[in-house]
Structure formats: C-alpha cells, structure tokens
Amino acid sequence: MAKRDISRRDFLKGTAAAGLGLAASSALGLGGMALAEAAATYKPGKYQATAYGNLSYVTVECEFSETALTGVEIISQNETPVLFSQVQDQLIPAIIENQAGGLDAITSATNSSRAVKEAIADCVAQAGGDKEAWLARTLTVEAGADETYDVDLCVIGCGAAGFMASITAGKQGKKVLTLEKAGSVAGVNGIKVSGPFAVDTSVLHAREGGTTLNVDEVFQHVMNYTHWTPNPALMHRCLEESKNAVENLVGIGYDMMEANFRFETPFFEEKGGFHLIKNALDERVELWNKALADAGVQVLFNTTATGLIMDGDTAKGVTAKKADGTSVTVNAKAVIIASGGYLGNRDLQEKFLKTRKLNAAAGGNSLCTGDGILMATDAGAVMTKTFGYCPCEYGGTNSKASRPAKQDKYDQNYAFKFGLYGNLLVDAEGKRFINEGLLCDYPMSYGSEQIVLNAPWYGIVDQAYVDAMTTQGLYEYTLAKGATTDKGVWFIGNYFKDRILDKLPEDIEEGIREGWLAKADTIEELAEAFGLTDLPETVAKYNEYCDKGVDEEFGTNPWYLSKIETGPFYAVQCEPSAWSTFGGIRTDDRLRALKADNTPLLGLYVVGTDNGSMYYSPYYDVPGFCYGLCVDSGYIAANEAVEYIK
C-alpha cells in the first residue's frame, strides 16, 4: 500500500459566505440537507492541533474570523493518499461550508476523518468556541425522489467478489447495477489485499522454472485440512477457475508476481501459488474504476441494500437506501450477494462467533454488517454451521487504543507485538490457553481460534524482555536462544530481521495512559490490574518450564520460552482483529443459495465471505486463500447468472 509524507502544505481554504455550494455535501452522499442551528463567536487567528488517524498523526491549522471557521490547512500527515484525498476534497470543505463538526465520516476513511474532525474541534476550543457544541452540530438529511432501475443483474457489494462478478457479467453485455455502501471503490477491503492464491496462471508459468502446482494437489490439501467441511464440488471448481479469475485481474492492469509468504505454508517455492499484487493502492483505484466503466457497470455508492424482491422462490430484484434516505428499487433478472460478511456487526459476532471483541483489522468500523446474509435468510436460504474469521497477523488490538496493530507496518504501538511474539499469554483468569509459539509461527491459521475464544487475552513480559525487544528485536533474541531460520525450523524468523521495537518504552507509556496496558513491580500487583487471579501461579509454573527448556503443558518451542523474573512486569490486554468473517449462506457448486431441503432459490447467488460453503475455521494455512475464493466465486457466479438470464 503506497504511502507518502506530506512535505508541501496541502492547503484547503474556503469561507462560509462564499461557500462551495452543495457540491461538498453531495460528494459525501448526503443529498439535500438543512444545517442544524449553529452560531459562535471566536478569537480571530490561526490555531493548530493534532490527532491520530489511521496510520499517522494528522496536524491541522485552522483560521477563524470572529464568527466562523474560514480555512483548514493540513500541515502534516502520512495517511493512505487515495483515502485521505477524499477527506480533503469532501469532508473538510463540507465542514467549512456548514460550520459543523458532527458530519459523518468518509466511509472509506473513517479514522482519517475522525482525526481531522477531532483536530479541528480542538482548534475551535483554542479559538474560544464550544468544542462539544461544535462536534454536536449535524446536518438534517432530506431524501430525494424514489429511484427505480431495470437491469439484468444486481450485485450487492463491490468488494473483491462483487467487483469480479460485476465486470465478468458486464463484459458479456449484461446490464449490471452494483450497490456499494462505501463512498468509492477506495473504501472496500477487496482493493487493499496483498493478493490471491491461484493455480496454473500465466504469472506462475512465466516465472523461471514455471510451476509444478496443480489443482488436485491443492484440493486434497485444503479438504484434508478442513476435514472435508466445505462443499467439495464448489471448492474444486473454484480452484479450477482460479486461473481465469487471476487473468481477469491481470487483464485490467494488475501487476502480479509469485511470492513466498512470511510464515511457512504448504505451497511455496516451486509450488507457490500466492500472487502478490505489486500495484499501489492509488493505481488499483484507477484500474477498478476504469474496469467498471469499460464493462458498462453502473455503481451506486453510499447505497445500502435493504432487502430482496422475491416472487416465491425466485429473486426478482433488490430494495436499497441511499445515504440521504432516497429509496431505490432495482428490478433484476438475477441477484448476486457479495456484501462481505458480518465483521461490522457486534450482535452477529456474538451470535456466530460468541464474542463481541473482534475488531476490524483495517481500523475504524467495518461496513460489512451481515446485510446480505440476513436478506438471504429472510428469503428462505439457510446458513452453514461453520463460523470463523480471517485473522490479522500483525499483533493484538484493543478498542481503547489509538494505534492498534493493523497492517504490516511497524509504526503502530509496539506493545501489541506481545500479543503474538511467542511470549507468555494468559486468559482473563491468568491461565495459559495456547502454545504461544503458534501465534508467532502461524498467526492466521493454527494460532487464531484460541485467541477469539479467549478474548481479551493478555501478553505477559518482564523488563528484561522489554529491553531485549527494544535493543535486539525478536530475530536476534530468538536466534541467540537456539532458533535457526532453516526451512522447516523457524521459517518466519527472517520476517523479524531488523524489526527492532526501538520506540517500545514510549509506546508502553501510551498503553498505560489509554488503559489497555498495566505495569507493576510484582506479579501479584500486575494480576490485580486486570483481575488475573491465577497469574502468580501460572508465572511460577511457566518459569519452571523456562528453566527446564521444556514446555510440559503445551509444547511451545524452547526458543520462545522467556523467563519472567525481572521487574517491573507488564500485561498487554489484547483483542483479536480480522480482515473478514466466515460463515454464511449454504450454496451449491453453482453458487446458488439453497433452502433447507437443498433446492435452490432461483436467480440468487451468494459469493465471497457471505458464502458459507467455501470457508472453514480456523482459517486456511494457504496465503491469499480468502481473497482467492472471493474472486473465484465472483467469476463463477457471474457466468452462472449470465447463463441463467439467457
């Protein structure tokens, strides 16, 4: 994902009097609006404030007249350029025009929006205004006239699966309308992923030595790994069609290369099937927009599907709402559900995963709230009985934290690395619950299930370990304890090379201030901080294992055993995060939604992570498999829908 430092001053200036018309408001998807009552008196001048966004601190300079905020200048930030540009081009002008700090965030840039709004509100306070009143000022949305569309195919969601389905059907001459909650394609998860797993592609054949990987080999591995839980015929078909899905991506301009993943997987080197996408996010956005336009696909952004139009057991269309409340009716000959699972719905998390602690790995609030799954079940479809999630592999998170670990960057709070560095981990009672090395070696597969079942969990370390990570890092520290980075030994080790947690001391202090990290002079005091009743006994037993060099309880590799004896001691409260959820609608190998008697709902297809017949818990040990199945299923469903429409 491309990043840039802002060395020049990105300047946005406007006045409430001159205004920007309704352009800024319309860009936010708000339609016609009336401003809530707003009046203020300020000390004229310029004021600066800073707040943390998604990847960096954002500093703004605000200029005030006696009666209004007249300008906002971005002094510095290092957010994702294509996302932050929407905050600059849409949100800031709307704030200035309407003199309101309570506007909705840009849906694709929630954290960046929040940082800008918080910083501007701080400047309001410096200028003598009422910060809370400023943040409370909102816009009253007025819905537009009802809209009706008549199309061949309606696709719900424009993420990985929905995008693939849309362009695949559109290129075959079908009239496609796609509904997307986000304000642009930049806001969907599918555009940000590292790459798909696929077999027999031109990318694999083009590399030196070609490829020895075949469909049957991968099929047997994933079916045995999952104990034959997914739909076998669908899985085999996805793997067979994976090359065509990847060729579609290459065809729109994706530059891919086969690459080994950071942790050991069953397929790498001459059998590798992970396709790393080399295009920067900004370029991907351009490629997606062009591909949709070239395929003749119409996308309604800031639009949420609300229900299916059914004629008995046959799908006939979709109802939806725009962000301004406008009602939309889409009459369609077929419908593809690709709304991305339920990560953004805490109630469905609790229902299916038995936790409310699963956070969005990308930060902010996920737009994937289970809409497609609920619509399909309302129409008579049934769900599978396997539920899970695609875990974030970069560290713990916490809803209290301003900088949780969420991307392959070491600019987040380093203390969250203690959620998966192989050090001692305990549950809410202070008891061990896992072989800690699994979370370091295989954070997305073998290590993932127990952390969601035991959330929140706690990383326990002492000062000696903190000092070692601050000066040596995990790579040198673990090699000194006997690990080797040979294949089949400490495979992931090279990933940690030169990744030293040099800012750890200040990050620990930040965690203490935010309330998700505790520091104490004794283990007993540390236990009291989070109510970890059994922690003293656990540490005593764990230290015995460290002395023996053998974990007699869970078999953790000895190079991960780090004795806890040098105070002060630290506990990091961790919550899991995910890229997506698993568990959804049962389908056949044609992606048709099935009823309880296994007969299909005609014209209704379910793809991506809304589909419950392709995924498993814990997540696959094959990198890129979630994204691969998303694009595979989107490709297959589109072709099935095109044939059905005929």
State the predicted function of each range.
Residues A2-L22:
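N-terminal secretory signal peptides and thylakoid transit peptides that target proteins
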Residues T326, N331-K400, G624-C630, I636:
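Glycine-rich loop(s) and the adjacent beta-strand/alpha-helix scaffold that form part
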Residues A40-R137:
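Active-site- and interface-proximal helix/loop "cap" or "latch" segments in soluble metabolic
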Residues G307, T522, T533-P618:
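A glycine-rich dinucleotide-binding beta-alpha-beta segment and adjacent secondary-structure elements
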Residues S184-Q298, D347, L425, R432, ...:
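Conserved N-terminal/central alpha/beta ligand/cofactor-binding core
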Residues L153-L177:
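N-terminal Rossmann-like FAD-binding beta1-loop-alpha1 element of flavoenzymes
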Residues I373-M375, V382-A529:
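An anion/pyrophosphate-binding glycine-rich loop and adjacent beta-alpha core
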Residues R4, S26-Q48, E61, R137-T148:
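C-terminal segment of N-terminal export signals and the immediately downstream linker at the start
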